[in-house]
């Protein structure tokens, strides 16, 4: 086709007088029908765009939709996709190797295991409420201007390690935990004893107000809303933090205060970290002139922030039905224990049901028996 185009444009032969106009016209007329027919046949068979595999983000999203797992996270199990001109959806660069095939199979197995449940009932729900110093860490993170506890609108001095141990045995509901910084590094600001007992969604309620920090750590009523979010993370120090992700959406905390509610998604063993938005991130003072942290000068009128009075988390929230939708995608109405009076018959039915859901185009009937054999062999051997 490229040669045809160059001949048609007079670029070939190199010298224009090597081919007479009549010969050029005759050559093009002879080649055009066959080239057009070949191009049309290829387009009819494969489409106009080149076929490519899904990149890892698309693959993850497809598994989420297929298995009804909206929070499935398997992207990092797959090798990073090559890019072309900053795009990772170019067919020529989306090659595939045995390493990727192995990673894809591992990711799919992980997703299938997450989709299945084995318990006859959802995990038990638990409610935990914290007040006072249990709303945050024992010490400030980023200097005293960044975070402190307050009573009656006045900031309290930092406690010694011995005083902290004694203070943490009390609830002190009259204290507020005030936060005037956005996340950065180092940063580990999360409530005590708030922990996900099982992977799932949790309902979070808290009482808070937006405030202004003025000279001497004195609090004034805020003059605008302060946006915040939560971040899922392990309850570890900042040097051990990993897999930190925003959850629960954006919440605007008002000056008049109130009770706010959101839903967060947490893997088992994780907690929620406060994530103020648009506030300073104190930097370590490398020159050592102002102490360990360098908090920027306050805006006129005071530094905006949020004061928290209490926080509670309840969950995991049970799905509307049990087993959940992801389990029913695989096993339909066979229940959490997957018991069947006719295992072979149900296995074939579920296989065809899943193929119809997963396939992008009709699957020929003659292609299915080979998968029947795999499933029935596994049933006979008792393979889980």
Predicted regions and their residues:
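Low-complexity, glycine/serine/threonine/alanine-rich intrinsically disordered linker
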Residues: 2-11, 19-384
